[in-house]
């Protein structure tokens, strides 16, 4: 029997973003090719976070993330709870939650009217029907990838961009590229696994 191929989960998440942009008008402004998805460290009880990288023409002192020559405008970081605690539905909800923060201009900034401090509980009320619609339309292959139970692969930072570039410091790199990312293993524990659990 041929071994089961481990999914590239960060690639699958980008595919979800691209698919949602085609199927839901509310996400039509998204361009998955300009969004870098990575697995990262824990941040309190967060499932995931989004970081705006600013417009293409940015002030001096801000790092640039450029992958295969294409400048990234956002970074979505999937936190350990997304991999080890979440169900399939929660994983999809987290992805759509983070990209719902993106500005309609898709210019490397966040939507000023969709901050938690502005909307509070209304944010979830607006997002919930979008998640429900997309869950009904997600392709089987993406459902399978996000339901994976076992070891998957994910892009991770080998060297993580800081908030700013400061001269004279080793971490003050101006441009980050695919050279500063690697594809490594991550353990996924799915509460409602769609694939047979594997011991690793």
Where are these predicted regions, by residue range?
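A short acidic, glycine/proline-enriched capping/turn motif at secondary-structure boundaries
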Residues: 44, 82-85, 101
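Short pre-active-site segment immediately N-terminal to the catalytic Zn-binding motif
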Residues: 78-94
